[in-house]
């Protein structure tokens, strides 16, 4: 999966189209990501040991990875990702627009 935890992404379709947010977690088996402040759903909960009072909780729900696009930290634009190998053999992500390495080296 091209998107990692901590990346800044742009939502490209759906009800939150145009919003930017940081990736909280990645679910590679489901090909989904959870983005901070995007796709907020209300969940009705009952009282339990953790929460003595039940109620309605707002939390971010997962988005399919095809609905988000990575924002390059160098050119600050949404971009597709290319992969390349460095001289030491490491595989890194590269911005297709500015050709800079995206991975935190």
UniProtKB/Swiss-Prot annotation:
UniProt function note: One of two assembly initiator proteins, it binds directly to the 5'-end of the 23S rRNA, where it nucleates assembly of the 50S subunit.
Top-level taxon: Bacteria
Transmembrane spans: none
Gene source species: Dictyoglomus thermophilum (strain ATCC 35947 / DSM 3960 / H-6-12)
Keyword entries, A-Z: Ribonucleoprotein, Ribosomal protein, RNA-binding, rRNA-binding
GO biological process, one term: translation
GO cellular component, one term: ribosome
Molecular function as annotated in GO: rRNA binding; structural constituent of ribosome
Subunit annotation: Part of the 50S ribosomal subunit.
Protein name stated in the entry: Large ribosomal subunit protein uL24
Family recorded in the similarity comment: Belongs to the universal ribosomal protein uL24 family.
